[in-house]
Amino acid sequence: MEKTKNMFLTSAKELKTTSTLAVCAMLAALALILNSVASINIGPYVKIGFSGIPNQIADYLFGPVTGCLFAGVLDIVKFFIRPDGPFFFGFTFNAMLAAFIYGCFYYKHKLTFRRVLTAKLVVVLIVNVLLNTLWLDMLYGKGFLAILPMRTVKNLIMWPIDSFIFFTITRLIEQTGIFSIFRKPAAS
């Protein structure tokens, strides 16, 4: 319990450093670019994109508190820059919840492929499949059970692919030594 409390306190303290804010701003810019040029919408219910990678890097570097706030602000900014439909706070909540989950799994831990797969599976099942489908049902009235199978299949197909992409990119960046500037050595 004490370890969890310290993780949240340390992550919250990350918000007070200029370097954290600067890195978050750079990651936000990268996410906005990826959202504009590297996203594919397949109908109104399925979107494939890579703008979540900078979010996960922020969660990895700065933890669940900073990552959660970063994701919430970035989701709203993304909406204003490139709206894909009506604004709905449920999707912002989902971005924040996903960041919180990733932050809990990644922050101050050694990043392994198994850890990434597990974190991504939790996010896929809770956030992407259940909550996003619920919000789409509330917004468009298409029926939760009608769109659930399509969204489940898409997310389960993308789960290992997204996990591999994030893990590979993060490991490559880690090998350059850039992350060591912002992050203490991993514990476990």
Regions found by a protein language model. Give the residues of each.
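Loop-helix junctions at membrane interfaces
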Residues: 1-188
